[in-house]
Curated annotation (Swiss-Prot):
Cofactor: Mg(2+); Mn(2+)
Biological process, per Gene Ontology: DNA repair; DNA replication
A single GO molecular function term of this UniProt record: DNA binding
UniProt: NAD(+) binding residues: 32-36, 81-82, 113, 136, 173, 290, 314
E.C. designation(s): 6.5.1.2
Protein name per its UniProtKB record: DNA ligase
Lineage summary: Bacteria, Pseudomonadati, Pseudomonadota, Gammaproteobacteria, Enterobacterales
Keywords per UniProt: DNA damage, DNA repair, DNA replication, Ligase, Magnesium, Manganese, Metal-binding, NAD, Zinc
Residues that hold Zn(2+) according to the record: 408, 411, 426, 432
Recorded family membership: Belongs to the NAD-dependent DNA ligase family. LigA subfamily.
Pfam family, one: DNA_ligase_OB
PROSITE patterns reported for this sequence: BRCT, DNA_LIGASE_N1, DNA_LIGASE_N2
Alphabetized NCBIfam families for the sequence: dnlj, PRK07956.1
């Protein structure tokens, strides 16, 4: 071995050792400046002999040239998600289910961890060397983020120690500590860059950079929590034992992993972590509870996309107090007027909240809310801000009532509130600019006509410049006219025109959904399309005939009937067809001739599916003669419950309706 090769090997070994002490053991032996000096020395030597650079060298973390797109990686072992519980009662019920399934009265030993609020990733090591990394994606296929993961200093490019498996895929969470998040946003505000709403968004944005050099500048870190592939080696037979082995090989593991020998010990762990949450230095949204024994995990198995041996115990939504500075009124695509509270900005669960929906006039009355009031804000599910209550004991002297508008705040048309409904609506229809904008945004959306590149800002400009009044006008746009819009060059304009042309080929169900008929969602649109087959038959249907469609009651039937009775709506449909919008002719299915357990059955899908998309499942069920409905009723024959099935599953059980899981559905589809 040449002297320079020996020097390179020693430097790399030294740097890996100090990375391990810093990121895994949290016990650095040298100052950052000394680490930087060693890194500079290694870079200088590698510059002299680039032929001696190895892929696992610490210098190779900075990334290669920017990518144009992410490749896909299929997970050999699916990356499953967890079911959630939100209170002690639900956790104790979960604990009982586990014990009942194990037919044991002895307490289960639980391994409890933090539920990190970051991005789940899988990292594959072959003979101890990092070879690939991927996002969770849909659980089956993720994005190849290898170049970006290599830039995260907490993740070893090469494992160290003995008995490392030939192939080892570890799973874990990439996240951004709060200090790093604040620094990124501080720099962004100073330079006019993108300011992130919370550390999770910043971590996601950093990890999905096409340029790994940008990712390298972000202080991302990582904790390992599980394993996917294991070949050519062995691991301990407990979850905690595996985590300790990962740590010995150089992978970072949270120091808050704890074994609990009773349900009460789990609850104590949960409450201790909840109390420490503000001081952890990074965001979490609960704790994860897993059966520690791998043998018991195997015995318990899986259901749908989640293991029976683990659960996420989520924290309650965080709340903060702030002041309502004003209330504004927004108009949606159906004319619904929604009051929105403008708040004194406040941090809630890691997000700066300045607005909260007030839903409707009844909600304002229920709260007894006045402008100027001090209120409690909650981020329900840590996402949607809402006003929980007014702090009446601290009501300021200078408050004023909230006056609901008698005319549309956008177009000035009269407003109406139908008896029995909580929503107040603008009566202006498409003469209302707000309704027109929202209707067009819905029309071009991904699940409707799916016009790629037609974003909200483009729609706003088209309406404001009076270029577009109805959906049919979209298909009359030219690249020349679009080029006149802000930030729209000739190439982008032509891309939009091409996307509009492509969108003309659709399905009857998508077309109905795109029309934006009140109360007609995707499932109802699919049901109407399947039942009537043609637009002509649907337009001619009476209210009674419409109610024969699964999931369509008197309210929905009336909305559909009234929509097609309106001459202006019929005119728009005629224009759309004249512009070339079309869909395949219906395939007539004789249910009596179909040999399938689904033929003639009304089926409801609920929860998430892991083996296929919901759209694919619906299409296959319909092809086998099923009627797929969007809600559970006495007319429902079968409910297919995927992951995180909620109220629909509960209602099915209450009504005694037959319920099957995804695995059984797939078996029956192939029957």
């Amino acid at each position: 071995m040449e002297p320079i090769e020996q020097q390179l090997t020693e430097l790399r070994t030294t740097l890996r050792h100090h990375e391990y002490l810093y990121h895994v053991m949290d016990a650095p032996e040298i100052p950052d400046a000394e680490y930087d000096r060693l890194m500079r020395e290694l870079r200088e030597l590698e510059a002299q002999r680039p032929d001696l650079i190895t892929p696992d060298s610490p210098t190779q973390r900075v990334g290669a040239a920017p990518l144009t797109a992410f490749n896909q990686i299929r997970h050999e072992v699916p990356m499953l998600s967890l079911d959630n519980v939100f209170d002690e009662e639900s956790f104790l019920a979960f604990n009982k289910r586990v014990q009942d399934r194990l037919k044991s009265t002895e307490n289960v030993i639980w391994c409890c961890e933090l539920k990190l609020d970051g991005l789940a990733v899988s990292i594959l090591y072959e003979n101890g060397v990092l070879v690939s990394a991927a996002t969770r994606g849909d659980g089956t296929t993720g994005e190849d983020i290898t170049s970006n993961v290599r830039t995260i200093r907490a993740i070893p490019l090469k494992l160290h120690g003995d008995n490392i498996p030939a192939r080892l895929e570890v799973r874990g969470e990439v996240f951004l500590p709060q200090a790093g998040f604040e620094k990124i946003n501080e720099d962004a505000r100073r330079t006019g860059g993108k300011v992130f709403a919370n550390p999770r968004n910043a971590a996601a944005g950093s990890l999905r950079q096409l340029d790994p050099r940008i990712t390298a500048k972000r202080p991302l870190t990582f904790f390992c929590y599980g394993v996917g592939i294991l070949e050519g080696g062995e691991l301990p037979d407990t979850h905690l034992g595996r985590l300790l082995q990962f740590k010995a090989w150089g992978l970072p593991v949270s120091d808050r992993v704890t074994l609990c020998d009773s349900p009460q010990a789990v609850l104590d762990f949960y409450h201790n972590v909840e109390k420490d949450r503000p001081t952890l230095g990074f965001d979490i949204d609960g704790v994860v509870i897993k059966v520690n024994s791998l043998a018991l995990q195997e015995q318990l198995g899986f259901v749908a996309r989640a293991p029976r041996w683990a659960v996420a115990f989520k924290f309650p939504a965080q709340e903060q107090m702030t002041f309502v500075r004003d209330v504004e009124f927004q108009v949606g695509r159906t004319g619904a007027i929604t009051p929105v509270a403008r708040l004194e900005p406040v941090q809630v669960a890691g997000v700066l909240v300045s607005n909260a929906t007030l839903h409707n006039a009844d909600e304002i009355e229920r709260l007894g809310l006045r402008i100027g009031d001090k209120v409690v804000i909650r981020r329900a599910g840590d996402v949607i801000p809402q006003v929980v209550n007014v702090v009446l004991s601290e009501r300021p002297e200078e408050t004023r009532p909230i006056v609901f508008p008698t005319h549309c705040p956008v177009c000035g048309s009269d407003v109406e509130r139908v008896e029995g409904e909580a929503v107040t609506r603008c009566t202006g229809g498409l003469i209302c600019g707000a309704q027109r904008k929202e209707s067009l945004k819905h029309f071009v959306s991904r699940r409707a006509m799916d016009v790629d590149g037609m974003g909200d800002k483009i729609i706003d400009q088209l309406v404001e410049r009076e270029y577009v009044h109805t959906p049919a006008d979209l298909f009359r746009l030219t690249a020349g006219k679009l080029t006149g819009l802000d930030r729209m060059g000739p190439k982008s304009a032509q891309n939009v025109v091409n996307a509009l042309e492509k969108a003309k080929a659709t399905t009857f169900a998508r077309f109905l959904y795109a029309l934006g008929i009140r109360e007609v969602g995707e499932a109802t649109a699919a049901g109407l399309a399947a039942y009537f087959g043609t637009l002509e038959a649907l337009q001619a249907a009476t209210i009674d005939e419409l109610q024969k469609v699964p999931d369509v009651g008197i309210v929905v039937a009336t909305h559909v009937f009234n929509f097609f009775a309106e001459e202006s709506n019929r005119d728009v449909i005629v224009q759309l067809l004249a512009e070339g919008v079309h869909w395949p002719a219906p395939v007539v299915i004789n249910v009596q001739e179909i040999d399938s357990p689904f033929a003639g059955k009304t089926v409801v899908l609920t929860g998430s599916l892991s083996q296929m998309s919901r759209d694919d499942a619906k299409a296959r069920l319909v092809a086998l003669g099923a009627k797929v409905a969007g809600s559970v009723s006495k007319k429902t024959d079968l409910v297919i419950a995927g992951e995180a099935a909620g109220s629909k599953l509960a209602k099915a059980q209450e009504l005694g309706i037959n319920v099957i899981d995804e695995a059984e559905m797939i078996r029956l589809l192939g029957a």
